[in-house]
């Protein structure tokens, strides 16, 4: 899939939650929470500033990130679901 986000947008592929709890209980799809972690697969050029400059994103392709549960828009391509987020929607980079 080829997608190029614009400006300060970032495309993230959500990392699915475990299907089995630490205690060995299988978690059905209906009980799973939406993922709030993902891997960055594309990054825009940056946020345009009022003075004409562009703020370079601090997020890079390949970073693992945490984002808000209701942040961004969902995009589905080739059977895979992606999130398109603004850089400000990213809460943390997982190291």
Curated annotation (Swiss-Prot):
<dbReference type="GO" id="GO:0046872">
    <property type="term" value="F:metal ion binding"/>
</dbReference>
<comment type="function">
    <text>Together with the chaperonin GroEL, plays an essential role in assisting protein folding. The GroEL-GroES system forms a nano-cage that allows encapsulation of the non-native substrate proteins and provides a physical environment optimized to promote and accelerate protein folding. GroES binds to the apical surface of the GroEL ring, thereby capping the opening of the GroEL channel.</text>
</comment>
<dbReference type="GO" id="GO:0051085">
    <property type="term" value="P:chaperone cofactor-dependent protein refolding"/>
</dbReference>
<keyword id="KW-0963">Cytoplasm</keyword>
<keyword id="KW-0143">Chaperone</keyword>
<comment type="similarity">
    <text>Belongs to the GroES chaperonin family.</text>
</comment>
<dbReference type="GO" id="GO:0005524">
    <property type="term" value="F:ATP binding"/>
</dbReference>
<dbReference type="InterPro" id="IPR011032">
    <property type="entry name" value="GroES-like_sf"/>
</dbReference>
<dbReference type="Pfam" id="PF00166">
    <property type="entry name" value="Cpn10"/>
</dbReference>
<dbReference type="InterPro" id="IPR037124">
    <property type="entry name" value="Chaperonin_GroES_sf"/>
</dbReference>
<dbReference type="GO" id="GO:0005737">
    <property type="term" value="C:cytoplasm"/>
</dbReference>
<comment type="subunit">
    <text>Heptamer of 7 subunits arranged in a ring. Interacts with the chaperonin GroEL.</text>
</comment>
<dbReference type="GO" id="GO:0051082">
    <property type="term" value="F:unfolded protein binding"/>
</dbReference>
<dbReference type="GO" id="GO:0044183">
    <property type="term" value="F:protein folding chaperone"/>
</dbReference>
<dbReference type="GO" id="GO:0051087">
    <property type="term" value="F:protein-folding chaperone binding"/>
</dbReference>
<dbReference type="InterPro" id="IPR020818">
    <property type="entry name" value="Chaperonin_GroES"/>
</dbReference>
<protein>
    <recommendedName>
        <fullName>Co-chaperonin GroES</fullName>
    </recommendedName>
</protein>
<dbReference type="InterPro" id="IPR018369">
    <property type="entry name" value="Chaprnonin_Cpn10_CS"/>
</dbReference>
């Amino acid at each position: 899939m080829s997608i190029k986000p614009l400006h300060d947008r970032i495309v993230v592929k959500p990392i699915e939650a475990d299907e089995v709890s630490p205690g060995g209980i299988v978690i059905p799809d209906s009980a799973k929470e939406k993922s709030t972690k993902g891997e960055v697969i594309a990054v825009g050029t940056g946020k345009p500033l009022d003075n004409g400059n562009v703020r370079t994103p601090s997020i890079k392709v390949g970073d693992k990130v945490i984002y808000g549960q209701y942040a961004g828009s969902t995009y589905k391509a080739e059977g895979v679901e992606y999130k398109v987020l603004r850089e400000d929607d990213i809460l943390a980079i997982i190291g």
